[in-house]
């Protein structure tokens, strides 16, 4: 099995139906031997971010399209910071999502080494809990999830670990 990040924009009518769409996605993924790891919706309910544990990109695309979701992005990702079992128990904890478009030429090994060196520095901002990161296998971007009292604290935490921010979104777990 592999992890796939799916981003989908939601139109106003879909916002009310997101639970039904995710139920359909779960059923489609299950038919392909997969499962939804988590689904987060941006605060304004304009975008849903889904992580699927499924056999391959083709199976992920098929499941998402059959669930009626429009795919804006579908990429293989690597999980950093928690294992799948921990996510299933804690996925409702994260309330902020930070996006970072990774610089060209950065390797996964270099990224992981830097992450390991810098992660202890999050202790400088104790009100923020780093939850997990999904790093696109093509090294195009990463999504970092945090539990935090507010956006300013997330920004301070990112500064503590010298990590850039391209976007910060308040999120809510929906599955």
Label for each model-derived stretch:
Residues 1-124, 140, 156-159:
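Short S/T/G/P-rich N-terminal loop/turn motif that feeds into the first structured element of a domain
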Residues 116-175:
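Structured core of small recognition/catalytic domains
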């Amino acid at each position: 099995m592999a992890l796939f990040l799916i981003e989908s924009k939601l139109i106003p009518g879909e916002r009310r139906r997101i639970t039904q769409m995710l139920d359909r996605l779960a059923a489609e993924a299950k038919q392909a031997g997969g499962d939804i790891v988590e689904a987060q919706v941006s605060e304004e309910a304009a975008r849903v971010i889904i992580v699927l544990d499924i056999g391959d990109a083709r199976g992920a695309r098929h499941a998402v399209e059959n669930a009626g979701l429009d795919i804006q992005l579908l990429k293989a990702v690597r999980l950093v910071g928690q294992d799948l079992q921990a996510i299933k128990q804690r996925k409702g904890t994260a309330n902020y999502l930070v996006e970072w478009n990774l610089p060209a030429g950065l390797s996964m090994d270099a990224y992981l080494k830097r992450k390991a060196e810098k992660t202890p520095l999050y202790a400088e901002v104790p009100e923020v809990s780093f939850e997990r990161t999904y790093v696109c296998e093509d090294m195009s971007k990463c999504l970092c999830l945090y539990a935090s009292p507010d956006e300013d604290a997330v920004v301070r935490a990112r500064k503590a670990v010298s990590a850039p921010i391209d976007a910060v979104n308040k999120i809510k777990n929906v599955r």
